[in-house]
Amino acid sequence: MLDKIDRKLLALLQQDCTLSLQALAEAVNLTTTPCWKRLKRLEDDGILIGKVALLDPEKIGLGLTAFVLIKTQHHSSEWYCRFVTVVTEMPEVLGFWRMAGEYDYLMRVQVADMKRYDEFYKRLVNSVPGLSDVTSSFAMEQIKYTTSLPIE
């Protein structure tokens, strides 16, 4: 279970994972050794799963965000494994979920423009048989985006 200090460390790291061990320890009123041990435990427990740099998609030429809803008539484990393999190998897919409700799957896709989206779409539908409905919506404006989880 996470205690108050663990939660504070996680909140700090979500805001800036480049903080030094010394800065983190001071922020939670610990010395560096117990702070390091907590961080190590959080990693070992799979709570801290990576440290990354976040990029601005528009500034690197990937300004089109698409949300793709998919329906399928196929639900066998073989088909599912093939579908998951194909989708997880597509670098344009930033998020991929199996859903409850009207649609079976949801993808978040990031590409340069509509031409690149069309290429992605064709690759997707030609790689996986049995997609009965592929509906795409395109983001006009990003109002909020965060990778920080609400830690309380």
From Swiss-Prot:
Keywords recorded for this protein, A-Z: Activator, DNA-binding, Transcription, Transcription regulation
Source superkingdom: Bacteria
GO cellular component: cytosol
DNA-binding region extent: 21-40
Gene3D superfamilies documented for this protein: 3.30.70.920, Winged helix-like DNA-binding domain superfamily/Winged helix DNA-binding domain
Pfam families assigned: AsnC_trans_reg, HTH_24
GO process annotations (BP): cysteine catabolic process; positive regulation of DNA-templated transcription initiation; response to amino acid
HTH asnC-type domain ranges (all copies): 2-63
Function description: Plays a role in L-cysteine detoxification. Binds to the dlsT(yhaO)-yhaM operon promoter in the presence but not absence of L-cysteine; activates transcription from the dlsT(yhaO)-yhaM operon. No other DNA target was identified in strain K12 / BW25113. Thiosulfate does not activate its transcription function. Overexpression doubles hydrogen sulfide production in the presence of cysteine.
PANTHER family listed in its UniProt record: DNA-BINDING TRANSCRIPTIONAL ACTIVATOR DECR, LEUCINE-RESPONSIVE REGULATORY PROTEIN
Protein name: DNA-binding transcriptional activator DecR
Organism from which the protein derives: Escherichia coli (strain K12)
